[in-house]
Amino acid sequence: MTKEEYLDFCGSIAGATYDQPFNEDFQTTALRHRDTKKWFGLLMLHNDRWIVNLKLKPEEVLFYKDIYKGVTEAYHMNKVHWITLYLDSDVPAEEIEDLTLRSFELTKSKDKKKTKKRKEAL
């Protein structure tokens, strides 16, 4: 999967948005919840390869690291809850999309009142 294909997919997720949050770095892209701005992923260029950090359940982190060479410990994130996935690896596009949706669900705001107030403020 290419960076462009991946960002197109992320842009199609209802309630998702993305931006480049770091000054002077126009390649790193934060994948966010539109209402809370909370990250569900971080897309980066690392050693000339596109990677994305995604949140999973701890048991899923271990599982996916075991079955795919393209899934490793998270780069600059909590290694118990986050993975790094290489977009150009042995991980099929459908699996990348599924893992992205899982991360999106796991990082949703759990406080519905706060989310509602944030939406009203927008």
Each model region followed by its residue ranges:
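Charge-dense, helix-prone N-terminal extensions
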Residues: 1-122
